[in-house]
Design a protein with these regions (language model features):
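A structural signal for short hydrophobic beta-strand segments in well-ordered beta-sheet cores
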Residues: 57, 67, 100-102, 241-244
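Acidic-glycine-rich active-site phosphate/pyrophosphate-binding loop
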Residues: 87-103, 167, 182-193, 328-329
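Active-site metal-coordination/substrate-binding segment of hydrolases
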Residues: 75-141, 380
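Metal-dependent amide/peptide-bond hydrolase catalytic core
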Residues: 2-4, 16, 191-398
């Protein structure tokens, strides 16, 4: 079958299910699914995959939905997360955040861009791939994962561990405007604590104020931030102080201790060991102690987990076969060259590529500027194009 025939077949298959595809995307947006509260969306995805004839559909102990097509040794996985951030400014929205209104060729609503339209595209992309055919030696997995917004990559890590899976390649379907992201920075959350000696605030000299002791550390953080900014190259790390709080008996007491939280974005090559050395230098000569944050959580299935917040940076060569496959699919559908770039945001790729070193790209519909935005939306044609491109990648995967 020629490339032209393949493209025509892909589009004909999509046309036959187009209305159902759009309605499914709308239904996903209409269904609330905050982090660790994705139950109803998980049921929708599971039911849709079964209706579309996936070879196997399962839900793991954490609540991730995984659909399988084919049974070959080579595994290509698509991943989209089901959860969204909340809506805390309802009066500023022109569209109902959970109405999934269609206007000007766009679906509006919370999660439309980040990333329920991408999820719909991956589910229907899998169906189209099954209809047109995939190589006998290939398995396509379509993952609808949980709790990405608060626990980047943890659900995917647990899913792969529980199922003893190691895909040969992964496509994270986060919004890239169908540009191909070949890497992004990692991140870690670091907690710094300083102990004090509490006393009544009317006699502050009877105690030791930990907030005052923290000021030298904060100055060191500001200097570290400047030093990272001044490094040569575009792939720099960064550091930001994002929270500060005290453990105090009352507002008329000197606190017992003070804590700050750092968001440390990681460049390629930065490891737990190198960041540990950096933090030790930062606190040298001060009263502070530090640790990488381990954050407990409970999934929608009531499964407890502990999220270790060190997520490495990653990249992939533009010469890799996965990247070339995405480039070819884009050209097939859009008849033009795609854009390759380094993404600014963090995604589940911190686990697939950063921790597990599985070849990964980020490639999905929607403009990242719309993620978490008021009147969030995704372009319908871009969503359809994504499904066609995903199917094309599956058809040609080797």
């Amino acid at each position: 079958m020629s490339n032209e025939d393949i493209s025509k077949s892909l589009k004909n298959i999509e046309t036959s299910v187009h209305d159902d595809f759009i309605k499914f995307a709308q239904k996903l947006v209409q269904t609330k699914s905050l982090t660790c509260q994705e139950r109803e969306v998980a049921f929708l995805v599971e039911e849709k995959m079964k209706d579309l004839g996936y070879d196997e559909v399962t839900v793991d102990s954490v609540g991730n939905v995984l659909g399988r097509i084919g049974n070959g040794a080579k595994i290509l996985m698509f991943d989209s997360h089901m959860d969204t951030v909340t809506v805390n400014n309802l009066n500023e929205w022109e569209h109902d955040p959970f109405g999934a209104a269609i206007e000007n060729g766009r679906i509006y609503g919370r999660g439309a861009c980040d990333m329920k339209c991408a999820l719909a595209a991956s589910v229907y992309g899998g169906y189209i791939a099954k209809e047109i055919g995939i190589p006998d030696d290939v398995t396509v997995l379509v993952s609808a994962s949980c709790m990405e917004e608060d626990y980047d990559g943890e659900a995917v890590r647990l899913m792969l561990k529980e199922r003893n899976l190691r895909p040969d390649a992964v496509i994270i379907c986060e919004p890239t405007s169908l540009k191909i992201a070949t890497g992004h920075r990692g991140r870690t959350s670091i907690e710094i604590n300083v102990k004090g000696t509490p006393c009544h605030a009317s006699n502050p000299n009877n105690g030791v104020n930990p907030v005052y002791l923290m000021t030298d550390i904060i100055r060191n953080i500001m200097k570290l931030s400047d030093d990272l900014d001044y490094q040569d190259g575009q792939d720099n790390g960064s550091v930001a102080l994002t929270n500060i709080y005290c453990n105090t008996a009352s507002n008329n007491s000197v606190p017992n201790d003070a804590t700050i939280v750092l968001d440390r974005r990681l460049a390629n090559g930065e490891s737990e060991e190198s960041i540990s050395l950096e933090m030790n230098r930062l606190l040298e000569g001060t009263e502070g102690s530090w640790k990488f944050m381990d954050i407990p959580g409970k999934s929608w299935t009531e499964t407890d987990f502990m999220f270790h917040s060190f997520l490495p940076a990653w990249n992939i060569s533009s010469d890799h076969s996965l990247v070339k496959g995405a480039i070819s699919a884009f050209k097939e559908i859009k008849e033009q060259d795609p854009v390759l770039y380094q993404m600014g945001a963090s995604t589940n790729a911190v686990v697939t590529a950063g921790l597990l070193h599985i070849p990964t790209i980020i490639f999905g519909p929607g403009n990242m500027e719309q993620a978490h935005a008021t009147d969030e939306y995704c372009d319908i044609q871009m969503m359809v194009d994504a499904a066609l491109m995903y199917a094309d990648i599956c058809h040609n995967f080797s």
